């Protein structure tokens, strides 16, 4: 690929180049894939659960907790019918708990429709399911050809496209789909998982290990230097002072309290009573808690 072609997102990549990259990446993945337990299950429901979990949680933690979650809610129907409180208890350790609510809503919608759909377009219509998750489920569970693109896969695609200028999300997806178009049926899911492994181990944002990369003979960006993102000059706020810490603390208290609920009043760590009250009220509005009257709250339950 010539230097002049860099950044020209409208011009398709060479098909033979794409085929060589695909063969090299899939061969590397077949030999070195991370031994993740979640990859042992490729049924649509398990893939949906693991992909929603992995949106904002490290894959090592997802791998530890997904098995337990799936044992507690082994089917789409069991998750849809569960008490939301039980789902939130099982979600402990994954963070960003609104994802658990969205996952349960998606399960309920899918059950009402007769099961998880197989197309990207239909999956996106489910509550809380965005383009990446829809493409990941379609590719991994149903053999779809569209490559799911997150920030890690976007980085690899941009480097393979030899783009000096940042590509827009649409341009990255179009480039990724060029690779998907040259894959055999059912290979797009493996390609995406391979790219995730490559991004984690080799094709890193600021310090890629090009000499260890299985694509080094084909990648036009091999050996280039990539600058680190500038750090903010402001000191980082200690986690115990953040709203996330307070939400986690209150949610854990409600998890421990069970159906009877817990008294939520007073200070928590470095957060005053007003901050605690504002946070629990927001959690109620988001569906993460429900009021029992006064200062008593619990996780959401359907009855009583």
Give short role names for the model-derived ranges:
Residues 17, 23-24, 28-240, 244-245, ...:
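Catalytic cores of DNA base-excision repair glycosylases
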Residues 2-14, 32-34:
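Short, contiguous pre-domain boundary segments
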């Amino acid at each position: 690929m010539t230097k002049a072609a860099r950044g020209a997102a409208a011009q398709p990549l060479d098909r033979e180049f794409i085929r060589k990259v695909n063969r090299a990446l899939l061969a590397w993945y077949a030999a070195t894939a991370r031994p993740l337990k979640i990859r042992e299950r490729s049924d649509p429901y398990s893939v949906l659960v693991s992909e929603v979990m992995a949106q904002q949680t490290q894959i090592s933690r997802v791998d530890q907790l997904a098995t337990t979650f799936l044992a507690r809610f082994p089917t789409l129907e069991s998750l849809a019918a569960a008490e939301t409180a039980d789902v939130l208890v099982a979600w402990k350790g994954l963070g960003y708990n609104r994802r658990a609510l969205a996952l349960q809503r998606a399960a309920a919608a899918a059950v009402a429709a007769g099961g998880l759909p197989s197309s990207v377009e239909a999956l996106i219509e489910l509550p809380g399911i965005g383009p990446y998750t829809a493409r990941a489920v379609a590719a991994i569970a149903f053999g779809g050809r569209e490559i799911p693109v997150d920030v890690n896969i976007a980085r690899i695609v941009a480097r393979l496209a030899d783009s000096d200028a940042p590509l827009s999300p649409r341009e990255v997806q179009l480039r990724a789909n060029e690779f998907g178009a040259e894959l055999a049926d059912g290979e797009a899911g493996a390609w995406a998982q391979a790219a995730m492994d490559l991004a984690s181990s080799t094709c890193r944002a600021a310090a890629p290990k090009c000499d260890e990369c299985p694509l080094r003979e084909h990648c036009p960006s091999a050996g280039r230097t990539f600058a680190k993102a500038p750090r903010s000059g402001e000191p980082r706020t200690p986690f115990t002072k953040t709203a996330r810490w307070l939400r986690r603390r209150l949610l854990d208290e409600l998890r421990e309290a069970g159906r009877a609920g817990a008294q939520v009043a007073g200070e928590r760590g470095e957060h005053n009573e007003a901050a605690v009250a504002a946070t629990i009220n927001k959690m109620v509005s988001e569906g993460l808690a429900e009021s029992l009257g006064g200062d008593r709250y619990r996780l959401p339950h359907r009855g009583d």
